[in-house]
A protein has these predicted regions:
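Glycan-recognition and catalytic cores of secretory/periplasmic carbohydrate-active enzymes
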Residues: 1-320
Length: 320
């Protein structure tokens, strides 16, 4: 809710929460800007999750409501992957500064090892599963979200098993998603064709292109380009008119450069994360300026809803 900004008791590791990534961003910015309160708050988040945020098997407690004493019993490869992704960013940053966090390293290595237990022969990952590894939703559409932490885990831990696992995910993506232009089941608020599956597929193959050379690099780059073109088809090239009284229309939002979500959820969405970086990279890799040009359209359009003095975008409190 933007109209009161009150806490709802929820903490979420991935998807719309990304609490660990928010903590890392605040941690990094806190060091860069000498903001002690940001560093303190970030450490509270990290320490709390290290102490209380793991299940018996060792997965993240990916969604909890502390007001209702509720823990989501079903895990998703999407949220689990995004939690590892955040913590590997934190650990890599800390390593560069000469600091190590052995308990977090052990936790992340254990999770990556458990990921390999979950991976199917065709390279896919189940969309949802329980703490005992039993499968709730076998759909492979969320597979590319796992590629990122596997590549990062290979870089951080120098364990080639993680790179091999990541390459298997790319085989699945190529055979079942990219070659068929059938991107599905990445988002968690619907189970259908969606933008984020193609966006994640492009980002996953981009990670593999960055870490490979020669023909293998070219193959992953070509897959990235193909998936990126499809992902861009979800983005508006025009400004949708709003009816009088709708909040976004009243503050003058222009929709060009915003993406739709899925065939079930017909609304615009800010989700992009590294996709703009992927587009800039593709622009250089293939000497195709349209990729970089549209990345700028996306970036500038989304900044319309960044609140600042005199332009709070309907948000009740400063700092939200």
């Amino acid at each position: 809710r933007t109209d009161d900004c009150k806490s709802n008791g929820e903490a979420e590791v991935g998807f719309v929460g990304r609490v660990l990534l928010n903590a890392f961003n605040a941690w990094e910015y806190g060091w860069e800007s000498d903001r002690a309160e940001l560093k303190e708050n970030s450490l509270k988040v990290f320490d709390s999750y290290l102490k209380n945020g793991f299940t018996e098997a060792g997965f993240f407690k990916e969604f909890v409501n502390l007001d209702r004493n509720f823990e989501e019993p079903v895990h998703s490869i999407r949220r689990q992957s995004e939690g590892i992704y955040a913590m590997l960013h934190f650990l890599a940053y800390e390593k560069e500064q000469g600091r190590r966090h052995s308990e977090w390293e052990q936790r992340m290595k254990k999770m990556l090892d458990m990921f390999m237990q979950l991976q199917n022969q065709d390279g896919s990952f189940p969309r949802k599963f329980r703490d005992d590894f039993s499968i709730v939703d076998k759909s492979g559409g969320s597979t590319p979200s796992a590629t990122l932490p596997l590549v990062m885990g290979y870089k951080y831990f120098k364990d080639k098993r993680y790179l091999d696992s990541a390459k298997k995910t790319a085989d699945y993506l190529e055979n079942e998603l990219i070659s068929k232009a059938d991107y599905f089941s990445s988002t968690l608020d619907a189970n259908c064709e969606d933008k984020e599956a193609s966006l994640y597929a492009a980002t996953a193959t981009y990670y593999l292109a960055l870490i490979t050379k020669g023909e293998e690099h070219k193959h992953y780059a070509d897959l990235t380009k193909k998936a990126a073109y499809f992902a861009l088809s979800w983005y508006y090239l025009w400004d949708v008119p709003f009816a009088p009284g709708q909040m976004l229309g009243d503050i003058g939002l222009k929709t060009r450069g915003w993406g739709n979500v899925s065939v079930e959820n017909n609304h615009i969405d800010v989700f992009i994360f590294e996709f703009a970086s992927v587009l800039h990279w593709l622009s250089k890799e293939y000497k195709e300026p349209r990729f970089a040009d549209f990345a700028e359209v996306i970036s500038t359009s989304m900044r319309q809803l960044l609140p600042h003095d005199g332009h709070m975008c309907g948000i009740a409190k400063v700092g939200y």
